[in-house]
Structures are given as structure tokens and as C-alpha cells.
A protein has these predicted regions:
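Short beta-strand to alpha-helix junction loop
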Residues: 37-47, 64-84
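Glycine-rich active-site loop/strand segments that organize a redox cofactor
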Residues: 12-62
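Short active-site-adjacent helix-start/loop capping segments
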Residues: 16-18, 26, 61, 69-72, ...
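Aromatic-residue hotspot detector
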Residues: 27, 53, 69, 100, ...
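Short beta-strands and strand-loop turn motifs
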Residues: 61-65, 126
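Short gly/pro/ser/thr-enriched loop/turn and capping motifs at secondary-structure boundaries
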Residues: 2-5, 15-16
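Predominantly flavin-linked oxidoreductase catalytic cores and closely associated redox partners
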Residues: 2, 9, 76-126
Length: 126
């Protein structure tokens, strides 16, 4: 499969990156149990998301309803920014269908795909 396949079709091909409001406002507007997003939204609030994409070559704009899109109106710009950041951080990308999660003493230690099994020393939960 292709990297970013689902991302490229979001927002009618434009990709709504975030909302131009506080993390608190976003959490308050999640219809059911937004608590599971609390730590993620505080680690990556909209300001940091906008900064990240700007630093990676994807200028953003705010439209009605505080929705934030790439200035290009193309989700491809969002994917290219993510790929640029991955290259800079030497991230290896594997695209394969996941068959299962590998655990060691109840701790996630990898993922099993149709191609291979990939292990890790740890998984960081934010």
C-alpha cells in the first residue's frame, strides 16, 4: 500500500490539519469522552501543530469555523511535510497489513505484519 493513502482523501483532498483554537476548546467540543485525547492534545496543541507544519514547508491558513488547511488546498502538501520530517529524523517507513501486536510480559514490544515482525525496545505513550 501507499504511504498517506487515507490522509490524501481527508477534507475532500485538502486535509483539515487542526482547528485554530485552544486544546481545551477542542476537547470540550468532542461529543463523547474526549478525555482519552487529553494528554495528546496537551502535548501537541494546535499552536505546536501549526508550527510543525510551517517548519516543514507546509504553510497553513485558517478558514471559517476555525478549520486549518494547507495554503495550497492540497492534502499532498501535508503528506510532503510529514515525509520531510521523517527523512530529517531518519524514520524508516514500512507499509504492510498488521497481523498482530507482539508483547513481552504484557508490554508491547513490536508488531507482526504480513511481511515481517518488527520489534522495538519500548513504545512511548503520550
Amino acid at each position: 500500500d501507499r504511504l498517506g493513502k487515507k490522509l490524501l482523501i481527508t477534507g475532500k483532498g485538502r486535509c483539515n490539519v487542526t482547528n485554530d483554537c485552544s486544546a481545551q476548546e477542542i476537547l470540550q467540543n468532542i461529543p463523547r469522552n474526549g478525555r482519552f485525547l487529553y494528554s495528546t492534545m496537551n502535548a501537541f496543541p494546535p499552536e505546536k501543530i501549526k508550527e510543525f507544519f510551517g517548519e516543514n514547508g507546509c504553510a497553513l491558513k485558517t478558514e471559517r469555523g476555525n478549520r486549518v488547511f494547507p495554503v495550497s488546498d492540497r492534502s499532498q502538501s501535508v503528506l510532503e511535510a510529514l515525509q520531510k520530517a521523517m527523512r530529517r529524523h531518519h524514520v524508516d517507513v514500512v507499509t504492510a497489513r498488521v497481523k498482530g501486536i507482539v508483547t513481552d510480559n504484557g508490554v508491547v514490544s513490536g508488531v507482526r505484519t504480513e511481511k515481517d515482525t518488527y520489534t522495538c525496545k519500548w513504545v512511548r505513550y503520550i
